[in-house]
């Protein structure tokens, strides 16, 4: 039962094919880690590693012991599947290759 000291928060987790958003009423002073545990998402998605998961509140990275405020949305982030630097490097190389051979050969 909700009391006047309860706050409303959301916990979100997304896979490419499925997204979950759980709305909760939690006591004031609840941490992001506590809200994730209360959401049931760790049971629903056994692939989430509670010890190493990266989390944020509205796209801003936070620590698991961050105390939540009214209407916060805790987001559980999946691990990256590609190194961002390697992806940028590959795109830059592909762009250079396209620019080198850009003519049709008819101009001197």
UniProtKB/Swiss-Prot annotation:
InterPro entries named in the record: Mopterin_synth/thiamin_S_b, RnfH, RnfH_sf
Pfam families associated with the record: Ub-RnfH
SUPFAM superfamilies assigned: MoaD/ThiS
Top-level taxon of the source organism: Bacteria
Family that this chain belongs to: Belongs to the UPF0125 (RnfH) family.
PANTHER family: UPF0125 PROTEIN RATB (PTHR37483:SF1)
Protein name (record): Protein RnfH
The organism of origin for this protein: Laribacter hongkongensis (strain HLHK9)
